[in-house]
């Protein structure tokens, strides 16, 4: 890897033709190549144009890499402007604590990158499920339903899982992890359509990409019921993961059923939702800023810029109060 890095050291001038030639020459080493390219992309301001072109070139000339790594067409991340590139590098940089490397391109980590990118591309909607509603959805049956019944309002979104539910995921080496969040992505491919789910367990060692995740795909093949598709995923996990092979609780089925029920809840006509700021101080300051005027309003806006103004959509608040 050091040799390749040195070879690329003078690579970020304006020679796009040389860049593409290098990609073609080292197509079999594309994971390492991309690791180096994006590391250098955030180090030099003029690198963005080349990085965008190179990223597109890699996945145009070596599409099999994306297909093999994540089982789907990767073309949606061929960026067309620098904002998307910065978004990508920001995601990867924070997710890996600034460490780029081959681990980013192993199948598990590619799934994590894929779902994160799809989530951000669809507007980064996060749903926080109230514990009471979460328990009701955990106990709700999905018999008779198929993937054609799943019509969420967004192409991709994230669900924060109430810890009170006790949901979990299993990974080799570290065993069971509490399930923290679920990424759901609608997969409308040319040959099949369905949903992809990534279940992210809490890290036991606080390291990024510690593989505390599992992923599943539910596709509309022969209009099979969702319960049957979930059971197939459980059997598949049992073949490759020891924890699921000795799992009387059918954890994969339980997790998928719960995520499916959240999607179904989002399509109800009487969905109970409330937009909440992650930082409670932001909500108060936004209200005060809207009511202020003149210099006072300007000062409050300056304070507001220092706070985290991201929001989550809280589902089922009154259900939680009835259950508490």
Task: List the predicted regions and their residue ranges.
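Intrinsically disordered, low-complexity regulatory segments
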Residues: 1-317
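C-terminal, beta-strand-rich globular interaction domains
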Residues: 320-324
């Amino acid at each position: 890897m050091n040799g390749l890095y040195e070879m690329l050291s003078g690579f970020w001038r304006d020679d796009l033709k040389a860049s593409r030639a290098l990609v073609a020459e080292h197509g079999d080493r594309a994971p390492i190549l991309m690791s180096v390219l994006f590391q250098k992309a955030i180090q030099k301001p003029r690198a963005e144009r080349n990085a965008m072109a190179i990223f597109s070139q890699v996945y145009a000339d070596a599409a099999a890499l994306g297909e093999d790594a994540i089982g789907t067409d990767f073309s949606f991340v061929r960026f067309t402007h620098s904002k998307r590139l910065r978004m990508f590098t920001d995601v990867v940089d924070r997710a890996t604590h600034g460490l780029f490397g081959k681990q980013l391109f192993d199948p598990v980590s590619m799934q994590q990158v894929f779902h994160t990118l799809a989530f951000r591309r669809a507007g980064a909607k996060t749903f926080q499920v109230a514990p009471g509603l979460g328990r009701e959805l955990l106990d709700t049956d999905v018999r008779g339903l198929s993937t054609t019944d799943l019509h969420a309002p967004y192409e991709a979104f994230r669900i924060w899982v109430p810890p009170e539910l006790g949901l979990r995921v299993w990974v080799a080496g570290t065993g069971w992890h509490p399930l923290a969040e679920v990424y759901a992505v609608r997969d409308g491919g040319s040959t099949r359509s369905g949903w992809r789910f990534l279940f992210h367990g809490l890290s036991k060692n606080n390291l990024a990409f510690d593989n505390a995740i599992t992923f599943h795909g539910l596709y509309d093949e022969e209009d099979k019921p969702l319960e049957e598709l979930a059971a197939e995923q459980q059997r598949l996990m049992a073949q490759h993961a020891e924890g699921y092979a000795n799992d009387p609780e059918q954890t994969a089925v339980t997790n998928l059923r719960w995520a499916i029920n959240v999607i179904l809840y989002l399509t109800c006509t009487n969905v109970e939702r409330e937009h909440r700021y992650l930082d409670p101080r932001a909500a108060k300051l936004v209200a005060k800023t809207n009511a202020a005027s003149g210099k006072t309003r300007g000062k409050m806006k300056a304070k507001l810029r220092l706070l985290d103004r991201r929001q989550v959509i809280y589902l089922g608040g009154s259900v939680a109060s009835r259950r508490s």
